[in-house]
Regions:
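Short, low-complexity N-terminal intrinsically disordered segments enriched in polar/charged residues
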Residues: 1-38, 143
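A solvent-exposed, acidic/Ser-Thr-rich amphipathic alpha-helical stretch
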Residues: 29-83
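A short hydrophobic beta-strand element
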Residues: 82-95
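Short beta-strand edge/turn micro-motifs at domain boundaries
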Residues: 86, 110-138
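Exposed beta-sheet edge and beta->alpha loop/turn motif
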Residues: 92-120
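A short, polar/proline- and glycine-enriched secondary-structure boundary/capping micro-motif
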Residues: 97-99, 136-141
Length: 143
């Protein structure tokens, strides 16, 4: 039996993080659930804290309704520590509402962000997402 090293665990967690972000980008609202503890926490710097899978799913559903073609894509930059990892990603979607001006409806925006994931073994118990509230509009306006 092979010994589970810190590097092995970090590698497996990176695979889980990539799969989790793939699930956030998918159409199945319960897709991310398999990576999260039932009592896990999702914190978003803009959207606040959501405790437990039902609250996380409701927040995710709201985001998917607003941006049906949302894509969260890890850049490949990961940093690990014994209880988790941090990662960079891009988020993109098509602007569907005119809250930033009717001239921007139908345009695709792309923003950068960073997350850290805390694990219990290979299960995410906390995800914290950081991104700039003004970056979506800057992307749409070419700034």
């Amino acid at each position: 039996m092979a010994e589970n090293t810190d590097a092995d665990l970090a590698g497996r967690r990176i695979e889980i993080a990539a799969a989790l972000f793939g699930a956030w980008s998918g159409g199945d609202l319960d897709g991310p659930r398999r990576y999260f503890a039932e009592d896990g926490v999702l914190y978003d710097i803009i959207g606040g804290e959501h405790r437990g899978w039902p609250a996380i799913r409701a927040y995710f559903e709201h985001g998917r309704q607003r941006y049906p073609d949302l894509v969260l894509e890890p850049t490949g930059d990961f940093w690990s520590r014994p209880d988790g990892l941090a990662m960079l990603w891009t988020m993109s979607a098509t602007q569907a509402k005119d809250d930033l001006g009717p001239e921007l409806v139908g345009r695709r925006w792309t923003v950068e962000g960073m997350s850290y994931l805390i694990f219990d073994g290979l299960t995410v118990v906390r995800e914290a997402d950081y991104h700039d509230a003004g970056s979506r509009e800057r992307s749409l306006r070419g700034g």
